[in-house]
């Protein structure tokens, strides 16, 4: 089973705000400066203050170079090594940041994202909701058909890990969440099973099934290229 490591991956820490909307609908944050063990990679927090509550949200972004995948994989697993856990259920969803780089302004670089809306149905989810977490080993997340399709159609496969119950759904917690809802992790990789070649191989980036002729000769009459 081939294994891919991320080309880039990083936590974007949102700015602490006096309102949920201000934290959740922000268009930028701050890239983490650590190189390992992101302590609150996926986070929603509502903290009581002397005068008012404050809110903060973190999201985690990952990119894999999938340019070498020319056939839709039979299956794929996103594996993340966990350390700590504080109940932040989440979804991996399709991200839209620029190839090869994650910037402060990518806090909302999520396909289908709309500020102020419940984005549960707007985004492209790459798996079912992740609701359990090992703090002493790899957490294997089975990716769905949308992810498999994008792995072959996109040269850069991009993911955002986003807390589901509040951040994605646009739901402010009723009670103060003093410790936040977050997960910590370090090592990430993508395992996939190569699909059947069939007639899906690409010739110079064009699907073979869409080519009628090669140098004037019908492909049906060509045994090999």
Regions found by a protein language model. Name each.
Residues 2-15, 146, 150-197:
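Proprotein-processing/basic-patch segments
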Residues 6-8, 83-155:
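Beta-strand-rich interaction/scaffold domains
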Residues 26-84:
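A short beta-strand-loop element at or near the start of a globular domain
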């Amino acid at each position: 089973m081939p294994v891919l490591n991320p080309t880039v991956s990083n936590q974007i820490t949102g700015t602490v705000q006096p309102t949920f909307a201000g934290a959740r609908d922000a268009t930028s944050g701050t890239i983490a400066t650590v190189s390992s063990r992101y302590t609150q990679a996926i986070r929603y927090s509502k903290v009581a203050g002397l005068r008012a509550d404050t809110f903060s949200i973190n999201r985690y972004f990952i990119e894999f170079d999938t340019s070498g995948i020319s056939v839709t994989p039979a299956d794929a697993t996103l594996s993340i090594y966990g350390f700590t856990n504080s109940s932040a259920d989440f979804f991996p969803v399709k991200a839209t940041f620029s190839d090869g780089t994650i910037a402060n302004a990518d806090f909302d670089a999520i396909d289908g994202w709309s500020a102020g809306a419940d984005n549960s149905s707007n985004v492209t989810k790459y798996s079912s909701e992740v609701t359990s977490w090992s703090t002493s080993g790899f957490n294997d997340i089975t990716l769905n058909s949308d992810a498999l399709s994008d792995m072959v159609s996109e040269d850069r496969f991009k993911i955002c890990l986003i807390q589901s119950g509040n951040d994605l759904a646009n739901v402010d917690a009723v009670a103060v969440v003093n410790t936040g809802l977050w997960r910590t992790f370090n090592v990430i990789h993508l395992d996939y099973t190569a699909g059947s070649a069939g007639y899906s191989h690409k010739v110079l980036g064009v699907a073979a099934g869409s080519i009628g002729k090669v140098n004037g000769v019908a492909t049906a009459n060509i045994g090999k290229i």
